[in-house]
Each structure stands twice: as structure tokens, then as C-alpha cells.
Regions:
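Short, surface-exposed "cap/lid" segments of acyl-processing enzymes
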Residues: 55-123, 144-191, 223
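Lipolytic serine-hydrolase domain surface
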Residues: 2-40, 115, 124-127, 151-156, ...
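Conserved strand-to-helix beginnings and helix N-cap segments that scaffold or border functional pockets
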Residues: 76-80, 251, 319
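N-terminal non-globular segments
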Residues: 61, 198-199, 241
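Well-ordered, non-membrane alpha-helical segments in soluble/globular domains
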Residues: 47-48, 77-90, 286-291, 388-392
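Acidic, His- and aromatic-enriched active-site or binding-groove loops in soluble protein domains
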Residues: 126-150
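Gly/Ala-rich beta-loop-alpha elbow adjacent to hydrolase catalytic centers
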Residues: 241-246, 250
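Short amphipathic alpha-helices and their capping/turn segments at secondary-structure boundaries
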Residues: 49-56, 294-295
Length: 401
């Protein structure tokens, strides 16, 4: 049993005469709640105000939006505004009948998704590199000895690490990655000096660091936030939507730590999720069940669980595979890449129903079911998920709850 007090306890006061009116985005009552790396509110007054506004509003539905990797508060709120712009268009038009009578409120959760040690990767100090290497490669004793001594690992060792991942079929192509991540030629050291090559590997290491942080925040502060919402608006349906590592965060909210009292959620929406495609999977032969399997078996989500996935997501295809391979995470099932991300192939071994998501898809969902939405036609890459038809799928999922 988890006996640690929530940092969110008693954070949902009843409204007072001095409470200010809620902020609106595209006509939706909206508030941002920012959490720190341990899941505690950065500004407890911000959380209290958001819950006070919910109590006043008495919404029928509360939608919690969660951003992914490498986002600031400003960029997260801009993304949330794009989601809600599409939602307003749909609720006022194509989906007006489906959502008639619903009173929405929206919480935008912001979490520290940029590693402190790598906020400026080109200026990372030796201490930063050591911390990131320890986080990403905990079982590589030879590598850790080098970085603890303040050295760049020798070229032979770096090449062995690279050989381990570039033999994967993922590297039969040479796609361009967003930002400054190198392609296969750069990984081989053909165009980069060894120090730059090592720094790029440390950038990948930060991917693993954020994976762990998202799960930790979801199981602590994110889960506490949902409980606060349910206290402030007890009749409201609560819907969670997460992108990238935000999908891992909201899945962790739904699962919770072992022994924690269960939550009930109305729907769960995972957009290009950065966790294993076996995360919801049943045990198969020697492979154990996925970490998030209890979300299904315990019927935490009364409505639909929607999972977008696409082969267009080269960032997940490559970065997730690299990080998982380096960290030694695997759940082998014969004939399937053990390191695949749910945002590339969907939820596997989970009894998911499959839809092709495009402008013409009718999108008829049922309660208590997980759906893989093949999104090649509407999601062009890892980051561009705030598309009209993605939001339409989310709202159609909400409409059946």
C-alpha cells in the first residue's frame, strides 16, 4: 500500500467570493497546472485556483492534456491551443449532435520534459555527461569507468555500442531526424569527431531519462491531480490525453503504483506514445505481461482507450529503439521487434481493435475497449499530432462515455 501523502492533498478548496473567473481557450474553460520532476506542484496556489474554478464550473467532462519530450510551458500551451481550436470547430460543427449538452473544462499539465543536464547539449559539462551516461547505460561497466574518470570512451567502445543498434533493420534507411540527432553515417563517426559523436549518444541517453521521469510523475503528481479533479468536480468524467512521453505519463496515472487505491477514468488517449508496444500486452510464453496491463485487466478506463500509431514516426522508430537497446529493456515475443514503440506499431497482444484513421473514417468506438488507430494518412511525423482528424477521434471517443 502506498502510504506516502500526496503533494496534492487538500488542494481542492470550495470557491470563495474572491475567486477569479476561469481563463478560456477557444471557448473552453482552461487552466495550466505545472509539476516539478517529483510530481509536486511548482506553484501550489496555481493548483488551488484551478481546482476552485472547477468547483465553480461543475463541468460534465474534464479533459487533461499532457505534452511530450522537450517542451517548455509556452510550447506546451501553444500545442494545447491547437488541440482546442480543432475541438471547437468540431463541437460547433460535425460533432455537435454527438456532444450536445456536454460542459467541458480543460487542464493543461506541464512537466519538466527537458533534462536539466542537457538543456544545452552543445555545452554539456563533464558532470552532465557522467550523470546522463549513468542514467542510460547502468550495466556498461567499461563505459562508466571511462566517464567517471572524465574521459570520452575510446572509439572502439563507442563503435561497439553503435554496431549493436545499427545492425537493426531500423537502420536499413537513412531518415532525417528532427533537431540535431545524427543519421547513420554520423553514428559511424564518418563526419564527426569522437567527442561530438559521444555527445550525440548522450543526447539519446536523455531520451531514457525522460522516459523514467514521465512514469514517475504520472504515478505521483499526475495521479494526485486526477484525484483533486475528482474531488473538485465529483460528477465529471475525467479524460486523459498524452503525446509522446506524455502518453507514458497518462498511462502511468491510469496504472498507478502497486497497491495504490484504483482510479476510474472515462477515456484514455495515447498520441504517438513513447513506451513499449507490449505495454498493455498479455503474458505470452516466457514474456511477462506488460507494465500497463493492469489498466485493462482492472477496467480502470470505463470508456475507450485510443492509440495512434504510424510508420511516419521516425523519431520513435529510431530514438526509442536506441534508448531501449542501450538500457537493456526487452520483452521478447517471437517474430516481433522487442524494442518497438506503441506509437509506431500500436498496442500488441492487448486485444486491440484496429481502425485506419483518415478524414472519411466513421470512428465508432465502444466502452472498455482498446483501439489502434493507424494514422499514416493524418500524422506526418512524431510531433505533428494536433491534426483535425486526431482531435475528431478523441472527441468521438469521449462522446460514447
Amino acid at each position: 500500500m502506498n502510504t506516502h501523502p500526496s503533494p496534492h492533498a487538500s488542494a481542492a478548496p470550495r470557491p470563495t467570493a474572491g475567486s477569479r473567473a476561469a481563463r478560456h481557450l477557444h471557448g473552453f474553460p482552461y487552466a495550466t497546472v505545472q509539476l516539478d520532476r517529483n510530481g509536486a506542484p511548482v506553484d501550489p496556489a496555481e493548483l488551488r485556483q484551478a481546482m476552485s474554478e472547477l468547483s465553480t464550473l461543475d463541468p460534465s467532462d474534464v479533459l487533461v492534456l499532457v505534452h511530450g519530450w522537450n517542451a517548455t510551458r509556452a510550447s506546451a500551451e501553444a500545442r494545447y491551443g491547437r488541440y482546442l481550436g480543432h475541438a471547437r470547430t468540431l463541437i460547433d460543427g460535425r460533432l455537435a449532435q454527438d456532444l450536445r449538452g456536454r460542459r467541458f473544462a480543460v487542464i493543461g499539465l506541464v512537466w519538466p520534459s527537458i533534462p536539466e543536464s542537457l538543456q544545452s547539449p552543445t555545452d554539456a559539462s563533464a558532470d552532465d555527461v557522467r550523470a546522463a551516461a549513468q542514467e542510460a547505460f547502468p550495466h556498461d561497466a567499461e563505459l562508466l569507468r571511462a566517464v567517471r574518470a572524465g574521459q570520452v570512451p575510446d572509439r572502439e567502445h563507442v563503435e561497439r555500442l553503435i554496431d549493436h543498434v545499427t545492425e537493426s533493420e531500423i537502420f536499413t534507411q537513412e531518415p532525417d531526424l528532427p533537431g540535431r540527432e545524427p543519421g547513420r553515417a554520423s553514428l559511424r563517426g564518418e563526419a564527426l569527431d569522437l567527442g561530438t559523436l559521444w555527445r550525440d549518444i548522450v543526447v539519446w541517453a536523455s531520451y531514457y531519462e525522460m522516459r523514467e521521469r514521465a512514469g514517475r510523475i504520472g504515478e505521483s503528481g499526475g495521479r494526485g491531480l486526477v484525484r483533486d479533479i475528482q474531488k473538485a468536480a465529483p460528477s465529471a468524467r475525467v479524460h486523459l490525453l498524452g503525446h509522446s512521453f506524455g502518453a507514458r505519463l497518462v498511462a502511468s496515472v491510469a496504472r498507478g503504483p502497486n497497491g495504490d487505491p484504483p482510479l476510474t477514468l472515462a477515456s484514455l488517449h495515447l498520441l504517438q506514445g513513447a513506451f513499449s508496444h507490449f505495454g498493455f500486452g498479455a503474458a505470452t510464453g516466457p514474456a511477462p505481461e506488460g507494465y500497463f496491463r493492469p489498466v485493462l485487466t482492472n477496467r480502470v478506463v470505463t470508456g475507450p482507450i485510443l492509440v495512434t500509431h504510424t510508420g511516419n514516426d521516425l523519431a520513435l522508430s529510431i530514438l526509442y529503439t536506441l534508448a531501449s537497446t542501450f538500457a537493456g529493456h526487452t520483452r521478447s515475443v517471437r517474430g516481433v521487434n522487442p524494442f518497438g514503440a506503441i506509437g509506431v506499431t500500436g498496442a500488441l497482444n492487448a486485444g486491440a481493435q484496429r481502425f485506419v484513421l483518415d478524414a472519411a473514417a466513421p470512428l465508432t468506438f465502444g466502452n472498455g475497449q482498446i483501439y489502434n488507430l493507424q494514422s499514416d494518412a493524418v500524422i506526418p511525423n512524431h510531433g505533428d499530432v494536433e491534426q483535425l482528424d486526431v482531435v475528431r477521434a478523441v472527441l468521438r471517443g469521449i462522446s460514447v462515455t
